[in-house]
Amino acid sequence: METIDMTSQEENFMRKIEADEKIEPKDWMPEAYRKNLIRQMSQHAHSEVIGMQPEGNWITRAPSLRRKAVLLSKVQDEAGHGLYLYSATETLGISRAELIAALQSGEAKYASIFNYPTLTWGDVGAIGWLVDGAAIVNQVSLQRTSYGPYSRGMIRICKEESFHQRQGYEALLALAKGSPEQKQMAQDSLNRFYWPALMMFGPHDSESAHSAKSMEWKIKRETNDDLRQKFIDQTVPQIEVLGLEHPDKEIKWNEERGHYDAGEIDWDEFYSVINGNGHCNRQRVEHHIAAHDEGTWVRDAITAYNEKKNAKKAQNVA
């Protein structure tokens, strides 16, 4: 069996990983570990920012002032989550400008579910309940990730995501307990967003290019399939409370496994969407580019102010 000689730096790095110690920005780390983190963390940040679009589209059309205020607060939270995660990613030696350029060029990915349109108010509830619910399952696990800034960011973000999930479920519950037309709207939203929510956990681990190494380095603490199973299990009783039909006609409790057996995901659809062929891929990125360009003057003004402030400070010191 071939043995791989490790340097003292690599040995110390792996010792920390195995001891569940956090890797901090100034610690030595393998370049592949750094790149893997940049890929995952930036994708997470991009998802928070792009995810504002399908919900923000409904702020002016929310059915009541209360719903509008809650949705506005939620979308603002998502912006904050993106900023936390961009800042955490920058500790790995990459600039915000580089991260945004990768998103806008299509080089970097974001959660595929945000390339589906929000056609009704029920979709806003489904996003809060299913999409943020899936995100919580993933992010609770990431609170134990090996990279310190990412772990600490997840602890704060999860507290806010739990509110997002509850507001989405409560909105859908109101529809499900309403008129026949409202209940049908809730059912339609569930049918359209359930399967894309399952896709959020990524491909089967056997087909994932990054899972094995991410697990070894404890960037990820649970596999894609294990996280997806948790989400499936918790969603079944929630659907029952709503009084809606489960979109997966093959869902069945497996006494031996202690989990629900589920139907197979349409992976052709998954890969088609992440490769840019979803309903809204082009629209989402174009909107981001337009908003970024419109904000250039703000960034320039802040830069000029800071330069002037620093120059004045240096002059006073001299």
Regions found by a protein language model. Give the residues of each.
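Conserved alpha-helical segments that form or flank metal/cofactor-binding pockets of metalloenzymes
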Residues: 2-11, 69, 74-102, 168-173
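Helix-loop segments that flank and shape redox-cofactor active sites
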Residues: 28-33, 51-73, 135-150
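Extended, helix-rich structural scaffolds rather than catalytic motifs
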Residues: 184-318
